[in-house]
Amino acid sequence: MNKIDFVVTWVDGNDPVWKEKKSRYDGSVSTSKQSMNSVKAYREWGTFKYWFRGVERFAPWVNKVYLVTDQQRPSWLDINSEKLVLVDHTEIICNDCLPVFSANPIESNIHRIPGLSEHFVFFNDDMYLTAPVEPTDFFSEDGLPKYNTALSPIIPERYGTGNFQINDMEIVTSYFSRNEILKNGQFFDPKQGLKSIVKSLLYRNSQFICGFWESHLPYPLLKSTMDLIWEKEKAVLGRTSASRFRNPSDTNVWLFKYWQIASGQYAVGNPKLGRLFSLDNAGPDFWNLLNSGKYKIMCINDVYDIKDEEKVMQEFIAAMKNLLPDKSTFEL
């Protein structure tokens, strides 16, 4: 197995310097796009140290951990940690596009990180390792990224991610025909799991490829695939890179995953590896589940309408501390 790096992006939306910088550009966001760029997108829960603790405890085999930020670093972070590499936006995004306050341009350029391995796993900072993982959870023995997927319609929510998925699929389907995608996609491999197979059966006779189901779990990616798509779609990805705030015309990181699926250059992963959860449903049962080891990965997603944010935040931190009480070597 080749070296595997982890890449994670992070922003401290409470940082007054960052907030002042963002305020200089807020006027450029039209009213129709303001909800797409709400405070929720930048909220810092104080749980990021547990992301690092999870990596050290549950993935000690990782080669390097690249933390991508906009001239920020957590106060508790040990920048001299052996496996840690800090990456500033200026190292991967052209100066004419900076500053950016959207994940889309950042994620579209992570392959430019100096020294990044060909095989890497991209994490959002709400994707936590909660039980031991192995390299083979992310890549096959011959180096293909592992995914679970299904044919699934894209949901066009006004302030959701559907616009990005449509833009991603528009690119993918311009290079791969419906029949090629059905042949390459491995949608009916038993390892996909019954639920995914049934979903794909429902949509396989559609005239067009309706979209791929998205798990919202970490993304195993190949640097060479990102290079290839940039070579083919430089204009589109260049526009996303110049998108200071989230814009309905953006692509996102799923494009690179979808390309692997459409081309057949992926292996089917474990459908029970992890799951997406939302903090608006947090309660005793959820916090117990977090500590149960049932899932190796849990994406714990922030939402707009949490009723008692302070209470949920305290319970969130307490549950993570219970799971990962010991400092990691990434901490001072």
Curated annotation (Swiss-Prot):
One of its GO terms (molecular function) is transferase activity, transferring phosphorus-containing groups. InterPro entries: Stealth, Stealth_CR1, Stealth_CR2, Stealth_CR3. Keywords: Exopolysaccharide synthesis, Transferase. Transmembrane segments: none annotated. The keyword Nucleotide-binding does not apply. The keyword Chaperone does not apply. GO terms for biological process: polysaccharide biosynthetic process. Pfam families: Stealth_CR1 (PF17101), Stealth_CR2 (PF11380), Stealth_CR3 (PF17102). It is an enzyme of class 2 (transferase). Its EC number is 2.7.-.-. It comes from the Bacteria. Stealth proteins are part of a protein family that is conserved from bacteria to higher eukaryotes. Family members were first identified in microbes as proteins that help pathogens to elude the host innate immune system. Microbial stealth proteins are involved in the biosynthesis of exopolysaccharides. Stealth proteins are predicted to function as hexose-1-phosphoryltransferases. Belongs to the stealth family. This is Capsular polysaccharide phosphotransferase WcwK.
